[in-house]
Amino acid sequence: MITPPEPAHRFSHQAMGTFFEIAVADEDETYAGQAAQAVFREIDRIESLFSRFNPASEISRISRLKPGESLIIGIETFECLTAAEQVRQETHGAFDINVRALTKYLAPDNPHPPRNLVKGSESSENPRLPTNLLSLNKGSELASSPLKLVRTGSRFEALLTAQKDAAQGTLDLDLGGIGKGFALDKALALLADWSIENALIHAGTSTAVAIGSAPKAMGTKNSETHCTISEQIEVSPNSSLNSWGWPVGVGGGWPCPDAPRSVLLSGRALSGSGTEVKGHHILDPRTGNPAKGHIAAWASHSSAAIADALSTAFMVMDTQEVEAYCSRHSDLWALVVKDYGNCRVYGKVR
């Protein structure tokens, strides 16, 4: 028999350009607070590794590598870059952590025009960088990739290979589309180390991940937390939902009659992206042109990092591409909004 958890204790912390909030269902508020502070310290540590605004971060140092140089990196950077490359490959370049380099190349005042455009795309309307930015130490099949990740036992290394055709400034890595989700995954794992069995964590309400279930008190006035920004998720107490999990709103204000207005998260994550939050300047990394896929997208996956990256990719991909992707990944479901009143749900919502 499942015993409903005790009322949730809430804690918030600013990091990664947003506010992280933890709702912990634990009978001891002091213990829950200690666990939350441990999580926030871990998120701060991950930010120190990932932030492109910090010149000492591992991501900034990788972006400054010159051909032939390498950098010893931590397992977190290795894992996040590996996850980013996985999504890039699976979405055929719709998600790319090096898109900032492309943006700089397309700038009209760029004194160094691209010298490594993809063959067949040299027109000024459709320039782009090589899509095989990253090699995961798979040998000669990806030998042309400028950045290689190498793991030797417990040693992790990023290497920028020397390429005679590599353009200046090829690397300008930005983990903004996956880093917060990655931090949420690590946060949830740390809560498990503290034997916390019922918790929800969200990053600015754009990505959330949960374990266990919300307490009954989620339906009381004092415990309410709402967010109504369209492309963000809504952390919403809903006392009519009696199943196991944490009630989280989805779909924003878009009229989606065939889509759920809320889901129960437990053991998985939900992430949302959209033009109202990120603006109309989202580029399609495959073309360098403004994205024309969707105006809002949500993705739910067991990994918050993957959900975070996919919600960004689904903004770029067209509806048929999203449908095909979801059909190949049974652990995923997605909601995309093409235009007002035109919504599609793919995969089994859970």
Where are these regions (language model features)?
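Mature catalytic core of soluble alpha/beta enzymes
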Residues: 1-350
